[in-house]
Structures are given as C-alpha cells and as structure tokens.
Amino acid sequence: MLPPSEPLPRAVVPRIALLGGESSGKTTLARALADALATAWVPEYGRQRWEELRATLSADELLRVARTQVDWEQAHAARSHGWLVCDTTPLTTLQYCLHDHGHAPAELHGLARRRYDVTVVCAPDFEFVQDGCRRDAAFRAAQHAWTLERLHEQGVQALTVHGSVQSRVAQMLDHLARHQGAAPALPEPLAAHANQSEQPWP
C-alpha cells in the first residue's frame, strides 16, 4: 500500500457510497476498501442508534439518523486521504422510514437524494447472517430491489459488486481506476490484499 497523501479540504473530498440490504457485506467492504485506499471510512450511525434504543425508530428519529450520518461524513472527511468511504447513506434511512411508517419527512426525502462521486451496491449473493439486529433474508432482498429502483429513478449509475471481500475490493479498485478522472490517485490495486486468502463473510 502506498503511504497516505495529505488530507484534502472537506469540501472537495470525493465520496464513495456503499449501499445494499442488511447482511450484504457493506461494513466489511467499507473497512477493506478504506484499508486498500489508505483512507478513512464512515460507520453506519443508524445501527448504533438502534443498538442504543433497541426499538423501532420513529420517523423523527430516523431523520435525526440521516442528519447525523451526513455530519459524520463531514467529520471523517477531515481525516480522509483522497477518497472517503461511506458505509450507507440517507437513502437507506429513507427506506427504513417508508417501510416502517409508510411516510417520511420531506427533509429526509431531500437527504436521500444526496449525491456521491461513486455509488456501489453490494449484492446479497451469500447466506443471510443474523446478528440480533437484522430482520430476515426476504427483507434484505426487498431492500436490494428498492435501492436499485430508487437509484435508477434518481439517475444514479451504480456499480453492483459480487463475491468475496477480496473480489469486491478488486472490482471497486478497477472501477475507480477506470473512472477516477481528476480524483485522487489510487494505490497499486490490491497491494494490501494480493497475498491474502479469500475471506468469508461475517
């Protein structure tokens, strides 16, 4: 892995959004991709908030989750080196709100249209893993389909990644290398992962 470059100003840090249903490997991929890019990643605040309350979050609480997720992006951008990897976006929060309550605040709809430089959808192509916080495989499949539909409606061209952790990181690095344009330079693809064996999903 190449040494990290100097941090960019928060306003110009390019963001990578990782989306997908529950148990689709977003957090595992966020960590691995951030490691490969020698940069920072933004954890999912919604999960933390649910673990604190252990209850269905109200529409107002979900709006707070979306606002906090964006605030965390801004805070982590100051520590990023080139790219900022975002483990979910307010689009996911909107999906929970609509599913659980049938409606969502107008502000949440607006936050869900937040744009990212690269949008990635994690395919639900491995066995569903229940960790006590998640729902079930059918809900995961519905989330995946809903996410793809909403991105299409918004005109967002998303990359869907498949397979193991290493395979997904390789797909991401290849995509970034082909589409980076004026974005920060990438490290050698998979430099930190090339000699690792395939990692199972948690």
Positions of the model-derived regions?
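P-loop (Walker A) phosphate-binding loop of NTP-binding proteins
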Residues: 21
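Conserved lysine of the Walker
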Residues: 26
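Hydrophobic anchor at the beta1->P-loop junction of P-loop NTPases
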Residues: 18
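A glycine- and Lys/Arg-enriched "phosphate-lid" helix/loop adjacent to the NTP-binding pocket
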Residues: 101-167, 171, 180, 187-191
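Extreme N-terminal, non-catalytic leader segments
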Residues: 1-14
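Conserved substrate/cofactor phosphate-moiety recognition/catalytic segment
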Residues: 31-74
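Glycine-rich phosphate-binding loop used to anchor ATP phosphates in small-molecule kinases
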Residues: 63-114, 121, 129
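C-terminal accessory "lid"/substrate-recognition subdomains
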Residues: 2-3, 159-160, 174-202
